[in-house]
């Protein structure tokens, strides 16, 4: 398995080198909206510590990321009147991972509404900003 690349896009977001639609932050985790959401409110939660994926993350950091994912899921249920939540996490290329910094997807769901294809649609900035505010208000 290759090592962690400190120049991956999520590492740059964590360092403030790239913008994001932040939803939540604490000393160990950061959550922000996916700019190519599969559904409104699609949020990514990642550890601040360098970790390529579940195979090399510190177990305490992984546990904390999942606690934050639960908070985001609860907020998303309220903020988007969701009927359910999809949680996804991919590891290595063969497992579907595209950005090699551990991250968990939390996606609000509604019955009968299919998810958009991955990376198929870039949401408008004003919509993302409004969705981030809805989630923050529900936390």
State the predicted function of each range.
Residues 1-139:
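HIT superfamily nucleotide-processing domains
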